[in-house]
Amino acid sequence: MDAPRINKWLKPLSALYGVGVRLRNYLFDKNVLISNSFDIPIVCVGNITIGGTGKTPHVEYLIRLLHPRYRVAVVSRGYKRKTKGMIVATEGSTAWDIGDEPRQIKRKYPDLTVIVDADRSRAIGYLCDLAEEQRPQLIVLDDGFQHRKVKADLNIVLTDYNRILTKDYLLPAGRLREPAGSIQRADMVILTKCPDDLAPIDLRAAKRDLALYPHQKLFFSKFLYGQGLKPLFSDQSPSAEVRSALAIAGIASPKLFFREIRTRFPSGTDRIYPDHHEFTDREICLLIQDWHELHRKDANAIVVCTEKDAMRLALRQSSFPQEMQERFYYLPVEVKLMFDQEKVFVDRLLGVIQHKK
């Protein structure tokens, strides 16, 4: 666990921001501001920090657990999309239409209902009004912990093992959207990106630091990169002789991604961009230059990006030379609960669904 970096010069602004956040939460807690309830069970997957907890892989984990048995819909804001209003995603929807994360989910689960709308209540109302045979039996609210206009039946909050929540600071000095104590609104907390060698003393330290109530269940998850590389533009698999890679990441916390890439491909170049980054023409040109330089040294060199970046880079296919397209891959990531916690986790989810039947 690492202590977060805090910009001490911005602490006065964080104090002002905190006043506004606490007032808003107080008004919701006292029912001055109203949270809307719905007939369909809603599971919210959110966080208290600004990104970096692995939210989308955890949403996909819920889908894998429940979608075979229940009609599941995902409602998301559609961050950084270029459209407005409510959009029901189709297989042809792009990252510009619905955002990179909803596009990633829809691409993996084409028969899943995915809706993007800044007004999450409107999107959920639309789903509730569908005919019974189309109406979802469960709604996963993506990144909705601060969207208190919707009353979720189960709030799951994610927090990064590598960034101690209780030692972080409110925006803009730190990365907290709201005070760390707000985690007490959660029903379940998942400590994400845990190392494989997590020891009992680490578990006790995490429980102590988070100071959860007895009714709040704490889970531990880790990232898995076992699927292998997927081609982005072609159908060619990488050669077994590949030792070099140009690695591209525009996500909030790319450390685990780069560590995995360098474990597989020891040499190459790493390029880091902001989360949800929209690549400019100049940046694409620089990536092409990086590729040519690497390819001159190693004829088998490849390009690898994160799965989320692939949703945006796919829109720039024509900008890349053909030879680079044929060696362009992305690395999917999945999550797994540790310490045989999956049954307890699933039972809690099923309890929420059964309660509203």
Curated annotation (Swiss-Prot):
Name of the top EC class for this enzyme: transferase
Domain of life according to the entry: Bacteria
Ligand binding (ATP): T49, I50, G51, G52, T53, G54, K55, T56
Keyword Transferase: yes
Record EC number: 2.7.1.130
Gene Ontology MF terms in the entry: ATP binding; tetraacyldisaccharide 4'-kinase activity
InterPro entries: LpxK, P-loop_NTPase
Keywords annotated in UniProt: ATP-binding, Kinase, Lipid A biosynthesis, Lipid biosynthesis, Lipid metabolism, Nucleotide-binding, Transferase
Pathway where this protein functions: Glycolipid biosynthesis; lipid IV(A) biosynthesis; lipid IV(A) from (3R)-3-hydroxytetradecanoyl-[acyl-carrier-protein] and UDP-N-acetyl-alpha-D-glucosamine: step 6/6
Reaction(s) catalysed by this chain's protein: a lipid A disaccharide + ATP = a lipid IVA + ADP + H(+)
Gene Ontology CC: plasma membrane
Signal peptide: none
Gene Ontology terms describing biological process: lipid A biosynthetic process; lipopolysaccharide core region biosynthetic process
Pfam families: LpxK
Record keyword Nucleotide-binding present: yes
Family: Belongs to the LpxK family.
Record's function text: Transfers the gamma-phosphate of ATP to the 4'-position of a tetraacyldisaccharide 1-phosphate intermediate (termed DS-1-P) to form tetraacyldisaccharide 1,4'-bis-phosphate (lipid IVA).
PANTHER family in the cross-refs: TETRAACYLDISACCHARIDE 4'-KINASE, TETRAACYLDISACCHARIDE 4'-KINASE, MITOCHONDRIAL-RELATED
UniProt xrefs under NCBIfam families: lpxK (TIGR00682)
The protein's name in its UniProt record: Tetraacyldisaccharide 4'-kinase
Organism name: Porphyromonas gingivalis (strain ATCC BAA-308 / W83)
Gene from which the chain derives: lpxK
